[in-house]
Amino acid sequence: MPARRCIDDILAETRARLRRVEPEAAAELAAGGGLLVDIRPVELRRRDGEIPGARIVDRNVLQWRLDPTSPSRLPGVDESVYRRPVILFCDEGYASSLAADDLQRLGLEGATDLIGGFQAWRRAGLPVTPPPTGQNAAF
């Protein structure tokens, strides 16, 4: 049986291996050809909005969508994804750290995550597409 571990220790070990980025740096990387990937649940995207240009990928299929050898990969995902920055974000930057580590294990050496997640991006005043309102609102 594997030894018991707490998630905080696993998260700290994972983050020590990543070159995590602040919101402004993530925006610069995306403008320079990096790939921003939103792994938040649909409910949070509907509540808070989205980052323009970010690819939306459910966390449970992330590896298949960003693996260039997978028949289930996203359109446009090719061998270049192994070398380019891939910046994942969740709501506050926890799940995205673990997800970036999974992508690095696939060989995506530029995989990392956004420190503070979507909430930090929004607090930094970077562009956000607002959530729908009125009849088009999800709630």
Predicted feature residues:
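Rhodanese-like catalytic fold shared by cysteine-dependent sulfurtransferases
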Residues: 1-35, 42-85, 94-139
